[in-house]
Amino acid sequence: MNLSVKDSAGTPLYRQIYDGVARAVINGELSPGEALPPIRTAAEELRVSVISVKHAWEELERDGFIITAVGRGSFVAELSKEELAKKRAALMKERLYEGVGFCKSLGASEEEIQKVIKELY
């Protein structure tokens, strides 16, 4: 798993880890049943606290991206194409909701927001 985090990114470390793993699952970079590194190993590799990785793993499990078997570790969940599409849409909506909300607080109209999104895309 090729994952990196930046302490100065403005996004909590656990969320950066969550996003990286979720993205890898959705894009097929991580296969169903594939083992994730143990929490301590991932923390060492990413140079973050065990708590940050544990929090990310718990959120990923809660959202159905991974499963954890006591004593065996955490593994990528078996997800159908439809389930992956739903998870992808949910993550996009979550991120866009935050951004659109901020733009609205600046007084931007729907048309202005759509124009900016189109420019960025």
Protein language model regions, located:
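Extreme N-terminal segment that seeds HTH/winged-HTH DNA-binding domains in transcriptional regulators
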Residues: 1-35, 41, 87-120
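Short, mixed-charge, low-aromatic patches
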Residues: 10-16, 50-59, 70-76
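Short, cationic-aromatic polyanion-contact patches
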Residues: 14, 38, 72-88
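Beta-hairpin "wing" of winged helix-turn-helix
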Residues: 29-30, 34, 62-71, 77-78
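N-terminal helix-turn-helix
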Residues: 36-67
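Alpha-helix termini
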Residues: 41-42, 46, 60, 77, ...
